[in-house]
C-alpha cells in the first residue's frame, strides 16, 4: 500500500538553540563574575579581597575591594538579562518549530503593519 502523506521532518533546531544558550550563559557568567587578578598582602599572608592580620610583631590592614568593581555580580540587572536571553531562545525555538511543522509558511510580516512581532502567534 502506498502512503498518501509525506512525513514531516523532525525539529532539529532545539540542540542548536540549547548549545547557543549554554555557551551564552557561560560567557555571561564568566564576564559578570570576574575576580580581581591581584591579591594584596605580603609573601606569607594573602588577602584577595582585603582584610586584617595581627600577631605579636606585625599588624596589617588591607582595604576591601569595592563591591561595584568590574560591574560584577552586585548588578541588579543580571536576572533581567538572563530572563531576556531565555525568552528570546524560546521565541526562536518556537518560531523554528512552527515553520518546520508546516503550521506557518514563515514568520514574515508586512513592514507597514504595527504588530509584526505577534504575527507568528496568530
From Swiss-Prot:
Its membrane topology: Multi-pass membrane protein
Lumenal side: 34-76
Entry keyword set: Host cell junction, Host cytoplasm, Host cytoskeleton, Host endoplasmic reticulum, Host membrane, Membrane, Transmembrane, Transmembrane helix, Transport, Viral movement protein
Keyword Transmembrane helix on entry: yes
Pfam families per record: Plant_vir_prot (PF01307)
Chain segments annotated as transmembrane: 13-33, 77-97
Keyword Amino-acid biosynthesis attached: no
Protein name: Movement protein TGB2
Species this protein is from: Peanut clump virus (isolate 87/TGTA2) (PCV)
Source species, domain of life: Viruses
UniProt record similarity statement: Belongs to the virgaviridae/benyvirus TGB2 movement protein family.
Subunit structure: Interacts with movement protein TGB3. TGB1-TGB3-TGB2 complex formation is enhanced by ATP hydrolysis.
Topological domains, Cytoplasmic: 1-12, 98-122
GO cellular component: host cell endoplasmic reticulum membrane; host cell plasmodesma; host cytoskeleton; membrane
Function, in words: Participates in the transport of viral genome to neighboring plant cells directly through plasmodesmata, without any budding. TGBp2 and TGBp3 are necessary for intracellular delivery of TGBp1-containing vRNPs to plasmodesmata. Can gate plasmodesmata and increase their size exclusion limit. To a lesser extent than TGB3, induces host actin cytoskeleton network thickening, which probably plays a major role in virus cell-to-cell movement.
Main subcellular localisation: host cell
GO terms (BP aspect): transport of virus in host, cell to cell
Location of this chain's protein in the cell: Host cell junction, Host plasmodesma; Host endoplasmic reticulum membrane; Host cytoplasm, Host cytoskeleton
Amino acid at each position: 500500500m502506498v502512503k498518501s502523506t509525506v512525513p514531516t521532518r523532525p525539529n532539529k533546531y532545539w540542540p542548536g538553540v540549547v548549545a547557543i544558550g549554554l555557551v551564552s550563559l557561560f560567557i555571561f557568567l564568566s564576564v559578570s563574575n570576574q575576580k580581581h587578578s591581584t591579591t594584596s598582602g605580603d609573601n606569607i599572608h594573602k588577602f584577595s579581597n582585603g582584610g586584617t592580620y595581627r600577631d605579636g610583631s606585625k599588624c596589617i590592614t588591607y582595604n576591601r575591594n569595592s563591591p561595584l568593581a568590574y560591574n560584577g555580580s552586585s548588578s541588579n540587572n543580571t536576572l533581567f538579562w538572563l530572563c531576556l536571553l531565555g525568552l528570546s531562545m524560546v521565541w526562536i525555538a518556537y518560531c523554528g518549530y512552527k515553520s518546520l511543522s508546516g503550521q506557518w509558511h514563515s514568520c514574515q510580516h508586512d513592514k507597514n503593519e504595527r504588530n509584526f512581532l505577534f504575527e507568528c502567534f496568530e
